[in-house]
C-alpha cells in the first residue's frame, strides 16, 4: 500500500474519530444546557468556532505522528511534493467534497422548510461537514487504488 | 457512431527501466520530477501521464514517446 493510500485511510479514520467525538460532546452539552431560542445561535457559533481550532490542532498532531510512524515502520520518507497524479486526484476529491457539503446544505435548509426545530439545521450542517471530509478521503483512496 | 469511452494506453516503462541499467522506479521518478508512486501507477497502467510527463519519460530513456507508450487499437 502506497504512502498516499495509507494517508487517505488515516485521514478517514481521524475525521470520523475527531468529528464523531466532538459532535457527541456538543450534542451532550446541548442537551445539558438546553439553550433557548435567544441563546441557540450563540451556542452553535461557539461550538463551531471551537471545533475549527480543535480540528486544526488535531490534524497537525495527526500529520506529525503519522509521518514519524510511517518513516519508522517503512524506513521510507514521505514524498516531499505533490505531482500531477496527486493534483488530479486532489481535484476530484475536492469536487466530491463540495458535492457532499452542498447536498448537506440543501438538506439543512429543507429541515427548516419542513418546520423541524432549529437544532436540526445546525446538526445537519455539522453532519454535512463530516460527509464532505469523508467523501474527500474516500475519493482519494478510491483513485489511488483504482487509478485515474 | 464515434466511440467516446476511455482509450487504453499501454507502456514499456518497466521494460525500458530494465534495459537502462535496471534503473529503479525512484531513479526514474527523480529524473522526470514526479513521486515514485506516480511511476508505480504508470507502470501498472492505472494512470496515463500528461503529454509533458510522457515526453520527459521518453527523454529519460533517450527514446520517443511512441516507443514508451502504445495505444491499444482495440480500444478505439
Feature-to-residue mapping (PLM):
Chain A
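Alpha-helical transmembrane segments and their immediate juxtamembrane interface regions
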Residues: 121-148
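Alpha-helical transmembrane segments
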Residues: 42-62, 127-129
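Membrane-interface helix termini and inter-helical loops of multi-pass transporters
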Residues: 28-41
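Hydrophobic residues within the alpha-helical transmembrane core of Major Facilitator Superfamily
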Residues: 20, 61, 103-110, 138
Amino acid at each position: 500500500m502506497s504512502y498516499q493510500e495509507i494517508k487517505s485511510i488515516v485521514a478517514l479514520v481521524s475525521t470520523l474519530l475527531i468529528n464523531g467525538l466532538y459532535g457527541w460532546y456538543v450534542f451532550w452539552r446541548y442537551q445539558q444546557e438546553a439553550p433557548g431560542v435567544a441563546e441557540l445561535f450563540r451556542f452553535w457559533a461557539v461550538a463551531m468556532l471551537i471545533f475549527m481550532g480543535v480540528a486544526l490542532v488535531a490534524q497537525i498532531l495527526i500529520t506529525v505522528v503519522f509521518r514519524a510512524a510511517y518513516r519508522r515502520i517503512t524506513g521510507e520518507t514521505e514524498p516531499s511534493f505533490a505531482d500531477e497524479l496527486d493534483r488530479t486526484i486532489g481535484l476530484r476529491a475536492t469536487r466530491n467534497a463540495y458535492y457532499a457539503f452542498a447536498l448537506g446544505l440543501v438538506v439543512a435548509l429543507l429541515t427548516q422548510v419542513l418546520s423541524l426545530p432549529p437544532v436540526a439545521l445546525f446538526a445537519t450542517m455539522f453532519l454535512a461537514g463530516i460527509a464532505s471530509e469523508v467523501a474527500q478521503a474516500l475519493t482519494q483512496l478510491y483513485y489511488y487504488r483504482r487509478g485515474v | 457512431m464515434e466511440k467516446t469511452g476511455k482509450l487504453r494506453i499501454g507502456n514499456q516503462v518497466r521494460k525500458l527501466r530494465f534495459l537502462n541499467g535496471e534503473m529503479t522506479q525512484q531513479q526514474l521518478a527523480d529524473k522526470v520530477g514526479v513521486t515514485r508512486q506516480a511511476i508505480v501507477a504508470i507502470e501498472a497502467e492505472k494512470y496515463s501521464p500528461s503529454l509533458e510527463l510522457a515526453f520527459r519519460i521518453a527523454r529519460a530513456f533517450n527514446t520517443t514517446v511512441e516507443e514508451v507508450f502504445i495505444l491499444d487499437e482495440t480500444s478505439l
